């Protein structure tokens, strides 16, 4: 039967992509693209190219044999760390390759991703992704995660460029909620705490390693579900990405 989780992820992915794509078109011109981003060693243009690379990861997914055990969401995103240098180099090469028409190339990757998502759905199933077998819903949510995290990276990057207007918020609220809750789910599954997100963007930045870990920041980002409890020290678990 169709998966509600997959349907929700599909809706969030479309909404986040549409919002971010419109924002990039309005805000990121050639001058801004050449500026350094908030991610050390990455330009704004390379971040834009990475959006296409992120969507391409969904486009290349294929079905796997029945009985294949998928990675959990936490296990899947946990593979990012070991490939960080490779991801950065691949992105730089891609940015050079598509320099003449970066948005056209990114659009083609997104179109292929959504076409593959429709082809593989609407039932949730295990698919082979670049880093291992995952549920299609896991893959879709991971793409929402990529777009939300990098939308925030791009917005903060453009804010730093003198004389440049950052425009409206490129993050879709429902997509941010989905991502924040999913990242919290990874932490809760590992530690068993009963926590809830109090500040979605602050939590996103902590969990994604965009903000240095600080217990006061964590206490603003997360709250215990019951007032008799406190927020645990998650210094050994963060960042998740």
Predicted regions and their residues:
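Active-site-adjacent scaffolding segments
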Residues: 1-127
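Structured surface interface patches that mediate subunit assembly and partner/cofactor docking
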Residues: 2-9, 34, 63-73, 119-241
């Amino acid at each position: 039967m169709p998966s509600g989780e997959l349907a929700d992820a599909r809706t969030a992915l479309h909404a986040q992509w549409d919002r971010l794509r419109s924002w990039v078109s309005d805000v990121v011109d050639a001058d801004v693209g050449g500026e350094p981003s908030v991610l050390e060693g990455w330009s704004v243009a390379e971040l834009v190219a990475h959006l296409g690379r992120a969507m391409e990861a969904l486009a290349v997914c294929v079905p796997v044999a029945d009985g294949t055990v998928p990675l959990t969401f936490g296990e899947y995103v946990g593979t990012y760390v070991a490939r960080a240098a490779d991801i950065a180099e691949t992105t730089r090469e891609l940015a050079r390759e598509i320099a003449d028409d970066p948005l056209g190339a990114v659009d083609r990757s997104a179109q292929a991703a959504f076409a593959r998502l429709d082809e593989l759905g609407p039932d949730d199933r295990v698919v082979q992704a670049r880093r291992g077998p995952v549920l299609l819903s896991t893959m879709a949510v991971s793409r929402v995660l990529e777009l939300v995290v990098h939308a925030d990276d791009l917005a903060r990057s453009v804010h730093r460029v003198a004389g440049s207007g950052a425009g409206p918020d490129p993050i879709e609220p429902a997509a941010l909620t989905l991502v924040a809750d999913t990242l919290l789910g990874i932490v809760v599954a590992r530690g068993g705490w009963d926590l809830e997100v109090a500040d979605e963007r602050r939590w996103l930045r902590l969990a994604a390693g965009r903000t240095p870990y600080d217990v006061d920041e964590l206490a603003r980002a997360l709250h215990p579900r019951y007032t008799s409890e406190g927020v645990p020290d998650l210094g050994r678990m963060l960042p998740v990405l």
